[in-house]
Amino acid sequence: MERIVVTLGERSYPITIASGLFNEPASFLPLKSGEQVMLVTNETLAPLYLDKVRGVLEQAGVNVDSVILPDGEQYKSLAVLDTVFTALLQKPHGRDTTLVALGGGVVGDLTGFAAASYQRGVRFIQVPTTLLSQVDSSVGGKTAVNHPLGKNMIGAFYQPASVVVDLDCLKTLPPRELASGLAEVIKYGIILDGAFFNWLEENLDALLRLDGPAMAYCIRRCCELKPQVVAADERETGLRALLNLGHTFGHAIEAEMGYGNWLHGEAVAAGMVMAARTSERLGQFSSAETQRIITLLTRAGLPVNGPREMSAQAYLPHMLRDKKVLAGEMRLILPLAIGKSEVRSGVSHELVLNAIADCQSA
């Protein structure tokens, strides 16, 4: 069992990583006997894990209610969020309740925002079931729902009480979802840790076949890197923005193509190549390093071009609504080398459009 602490003073919390955690009541700290829980999951995961997690919590003396949401990015909305509030109020649940997010990024983000908002804030626990949520979205306290005009535009910074990563969940993950998670894994290597990127080049095949030791190391390393950034810049005023490599472009793809048609990791993968091409055009990143990124993403089964039906011009309105925009000016996350990146303002729209065009499918 691995345990990593996200250090945020009185709001610090543990990330527990191991196989078989769903069999251990102690995994779900800080829950105690007699407490009340609303377990939030979706219709795909409920048949796989709901009874198991409910059972282990009830074994610990916890009183468990549940709400099952529809599955898909298109349901990460205010309307679906309201179903969680309704379930909480109907029971009813008070300020001493705990929400448990059992699912991937959609369930985690939506449940976290529900916890931040319900009765002005209740405790919640992240139980991520996808690779993407285990290495990224469950850690750091970003919670949100989407708006038709932009991804994650309505939300809050709100830290969980703990994160429970059961590696066994990856055994039920569809290959496309595994690849989507690998995009966020590769991102960490590009922005923060060149040695980890090298390791990924050598060990990607092991990750694709869900080799236990390789996957455990991969998730642990990501869960070490992200908390370091979050602890230094919890509310994304500077350093934390680096974690958004590829996201300004990627969120544009997701919004333009319709939420759920491109998985988040797929859009981020194409966006990271666009960021690399932008950096190339600025003369601060080599084409050889861009090719290393493209090769690794391709091996992972990820797209490296934008949608053929989306013109370069179609990206700009979405990018100008990005949360990193300051005083009407785009701020882009750009690689400087494998393992090093920067937040860059003042890049001309023409250069960005040309970089996007470099990445359009033939």
Swiss-Prot record:
Q: Does the keyword Repeat apply?
A: no
List the lineage, top down: Bacteria, Pseudomonadati, Pseudomonadota, Gammaproteobacteria, Enterobacterales
Which cell locations does it reside in? Cytoplasm
Q: State which pathway it belongs to.
A: Metabolic intermediate biosynthesis; chorismate biosynthesis; chorismate from D-erythrose 4-phosphate and phosphoenolpyruvate: step 2/7
Residues annotated for Zn(2+) binding in this entry:
184, 247, 264
Task: State the needed cofactors, names only.
Answer: Co(2+); Zn(2+); NAD(+)
Q: How is the cofactor bound?
A: Binds 1 divalent metal cation per subunit. Can use either Co(2+) or Zn(2+).
Q: Which residues bind NAD(+)?
A: 71-76, 105-109, 129-130, 142, 151, 169-172
Keyword Nucleotide-binding listed? The answer is yes
Q: What does this protein do?
A: Catalyzes the conversion of 3-deoxy-D-arabino-heptulosonate 7-phosphate (DAHP) to dehydroquinate (DHQ).
Task: Describe the family membership recorded for this protein in Swiss-Prot or TrEMBL.
Answer: Belongs to the sugar phosphate cyclases superfamily. Dehydroquinate synthase family.
> What Gene Ontology terms describe what this protein does at the molecular function level?
3-dehydroquinate synthase activity; metal ion binding; nucleotide binding
* SUPFAM superfamilies, A to Z: Dehydroquinate synthase-like
Q: Which UniProt keywords apply?
A: Amino-acid biosynthesis, Aromatic amino acid biosynthesis, Cobalt, Cytoplasm, Lyase, Metal-binding, NAD, Nucleotide-binding, Zinc
Q: Which InterPro entries match?
A: Dehydroquinate_synthase, DHQ_synth_AroB, DHQ_synth_fam, DHQS/DOIS_N, DHQS_C
Q: What is its EC number?
A: 4.2.3.4
- GO-annotated cellular components: cytoplasm
Which top EC class is named for this enzyme in its record? lyase
Q: Know the name of this protein?
A: 3-dehydroquinate synthase
Catalyses which reaction? 7-phospho-2-dehydro-3-deoxy-D-arabino-heptonate = 3-dehydroquinate + phosphate
Which processes are annotated in GO (biological process)? amino acid biosynthetic process; aromatic amino acid family biosynthetic process; chorismate biosynthetic process
